[in-house]
């Protein structure tokens, strides 16, 4: 049984799909049988112990006979009445107008946004000069105050040193007078 299954598997590997299908339907194929599938012919050459051999013949587009199935075209629509055509034209015109209005609305919104941005930029530019001048004046005043405070502190230290030096001189003179 196992040898039969393995032999069957080997046979299946050798057979083409087409011969497999044909052998399922026709156990004994007729000699030199020609099968037609659309624009190709399959001709059985001979049957061997190892399998079957076939010749596949493709027809050129010019050889296609009128008997072969033609690609089906979509079914023709019935003739539309004048009223239907008029309704379609009106609907198309309405869609076009709606689309055009929508595009114009978007353009108007874009222009309005551009105007707002430009106006804001001009406003900031006009406000920038006074603000910059104000900041500069503030910084100058602040640095002037800091400088004056620093100079006042230096003067105070210098005055204290002079007072200390005068006291030291006085003490020295008093010692000299006492000792001398």
From Swiss-Prot:
Highest taxon above the source species: Eukaryota
Limits of the SLD domain: 38-180
Protein's UniProt keywords contain Cytoplasm: yes
Coiled-coil annotated residue ranges, if any: 75-179
N-terminal signal peptide: none
GO cellular component, one term: perinuclear region of cytoplasm
Function in brief: Exhibits microtubule-destabilizing activity, which is antagonized by STAT3.
Protein name, UniProt field: Stathmin-3
